[in-house]
């Protein structure tokens, strides 16, 4: 039985993981951490768990990584809004233990990322723009998934990523990200490939949080026998 510690247990993702964990017979929730706990409680969470699934905040994730290193606890990080300092810490941790990070753990979003990379290389002369939409209470903007998609396309094209075009026209070598917030939207991401005579659109829409939670739990199971390294969902889904 795999003991999974859950960081961010009272958030939308944490609650969904708790609701569906019984679908997986080879793992169980061994401990929970939420915003009402003291950050030092992460010590016991790591000590009593084989792997931690983290959907919390950048501040909590940073503390969690340090305790995971102390107890050699595997990590599955889905927290968004991380900065360079956090990614450097993830890379450091991955030298000692297996770590999986992804801004989106659904198979659909990762397939979208795969298709975007393939199409980008074919549609070399097309402009590319990304639109993402989430519920009114989402804290980070643009979303981690939008940044993942933009980074994939930018790497393939050699483009820059921008978030604001006040009083200037679009440059040929840039990808713009637009964010909408409202209602109870779980997550919509659209990639527009804009040519002179046609527009090609790729779209992924999450109907609920289940696909993200399933991906997180599968990641926690998958990572058990893996060597120390920094993994992504592409390693699991082979895309």
Swiss-Prot record:
<keyword id="KW-0521">NADP</keyword>
<keyword id="KW-0560">Oxidoreductase</keyword>
<keyword id="KW-0520">NAD</keyword>
<comment type="pathway">
    <text>Amino-acid biosynthesis; L-lysine biosynthesis via DAP pathway; (S)-tetrahydrodipicolinate from L-aspartate: step 4/4.</text>
</comment>
<dbReference type="InterPro" id="IPR023940">
    <property type="entry name" value="DHDPR_bac"/>
</dbReference>
<dbReference type="GO" id="GO:0016726">
    <property type="term" value="F:oxidoreductase activity, acting on CH or CH2 groups, NAD or NADP as acceptor"/>
</dbReference>
<dbReference type="Pfam" id="PF05173">
    <property type="entry name" value="DapB_C"/>
</dbReference>
<feature type="active site" description="Proton donor">
    <location>
        <position position="138"/>
    </location>
</feature>
<dbReference type="GO" id="GO:0009089">
    <property type="term" value="P:lysine biosynthetic process via diaminopimelate"/>
</dbReference>
<dbReference type="InterPro" id="IPR036291">
    <property type="entry name" value="NAD(P)-bd_dom_sf"/>
</dbReference>
<dbReference type="InterPro" id="IPR022663">
    <property type="entry name" value="DapB_C"/>
</dbReference>
<feature type="binding site">
    <location>
        <begin position="144"/>
        <end position="145"/>
    </location>
    <ligand>
        <name>(S)-2,3,4,5-tetrahydrodipicolinate</name>
    </ligand>
</feature>
<dbReference type="GO" id="GO:0008839">
    <property type="term" value="F:4-hydroxy-tetrahydrodipicolinate reductase"/>
</dbReference>
<dbReference type="Pfam" id="PF01113">
    <property type="entry name" value="DapB_N"/>
</dbReference>
<feature type="binding site">
    <location>
        <begin position="78"/>
        <end position="80"/>
    </location>
    <ligand>
        <name>NAD(+)</name>
    </ligand>
</feature>
<feature type="active site" description="Proton donor/acceptor">
    <location>
        <position position="134"/>
    </location>
</feature>
<comment type="similarity">
    <text>Belongs to the DapB family.</text>
</comment>
<feature type="binding site">
    <location>
        <begin position="102"/>
        <end position="105"/>
    </location>
    <ligand>
        <name>NAD(+)</name>
    </ligand>
</feature>
<protein>
    <recommendedName>
        <fullName>4-hydroxy-tetrahydrodipicolinate reductase</fullName>
        <ecNumber>1.17.1.8</ecNumber>
    </recommendedName>
</protein>
<dbReference type="InterPro" id="IPR022664">
    <property type="entry name" value="DapB_N_CS"/>
</dbReference>
<dbReference type="GO" id="GO:0050661">
    <property type="term" value="F:NADP binding"/>
</dbReference>
<feature type="binding site">
    <location>
        <position position="135"/>
    </location>
    <ligand>
        <name>(S)-2,3,4,5-tetrahydrodipicolinate</name>
    </ligand>
</feature>
<keyword id="KW-0457">Lysine biosynthesis</keyword>
<feature type="binding site">
    <location>
        <begin position="8"/>
        <end position="13"/>
    </location>
    <ligand>
        <name>NAD(+)</name>
    </ligand>
</feature>
<keyword id="KW-0028">Amino-acid biosynthesis</keyword>
<comment type="function">
    <text>Catalyzes the conversion of 4-hydroxy-tetrahydrodipicolinate (HTPA) to tetrahydrodipicolinate.</text>
</comment>
<dbReference type="GO" id="GO:0005737">
    <property type="term" value="C:cytoplasm"/>
</dbReference>
<dbReference type="GO" id="GO:0019877">
    <property type="term" value="P:diaminopimelate biosynthetic process"/>
</dbReference>
<keyword id="KW-0220">Diaminopimelate biosynthesis</keyword>
<dbReference type="InterPro" id="IPR000846">
    <property type="entry name" value="DapB_N"/>
</dbReference>
<keyword id="KW-0963">Cytoplasm</keyword>
<dbReference type="GO" id="GO:0051287">
    <property type="term" value="F:NAD binding"/>
</dbReference>
């Amino acid at each position: 039985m795999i003991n999974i510690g859950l960081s961010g247990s009272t958030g939308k993702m944490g609650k969904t993981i708790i609701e569906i964990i019984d679908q997986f017979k080879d793992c169980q929730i061994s401990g929970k951490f939420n915003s009402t706990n003291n950050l030092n409680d992460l010590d016991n969470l790591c000590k009593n768990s084989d792997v931690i699934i983290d959907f919390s905040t950048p501040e909590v994730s940073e503390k969690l990584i340090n305790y995971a290193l102390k107890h050699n606890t595997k990590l599955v990080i889905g927290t968004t809004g991380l900065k360079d300092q956090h990614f450097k810490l993830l890379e450091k941790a991955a030298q000692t233990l297996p770590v999986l990070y992804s801004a989106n753990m659904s198979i659909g979003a990762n397939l979208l990322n795969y298709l975007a990379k393939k199409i980008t290389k074919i549609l070399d002369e097309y402009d590319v723009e990304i639109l993402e939409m989430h519920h009114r209470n989402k804290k980070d903007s643009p979303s981690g998934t939008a940044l993942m998609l933009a980074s994939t396309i930018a790497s393939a094209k050699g483009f820059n990523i921008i978030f604001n075009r006040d009083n200037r026209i679009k440059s040929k070598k840039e990808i713009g990200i637009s964010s909408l917030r409202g209602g109870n939207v779980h997550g919509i991401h659209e990639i527009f490939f804009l040519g002179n005579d046609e527009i090609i659109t790729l779209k992924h829409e999450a109907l609920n949080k289940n696909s993200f939670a399933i991906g997180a739990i599968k990641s926690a199971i998958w990572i058990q026998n893996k060597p120390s390294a920094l993994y992504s969902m592409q390693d699991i889904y082979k895309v």
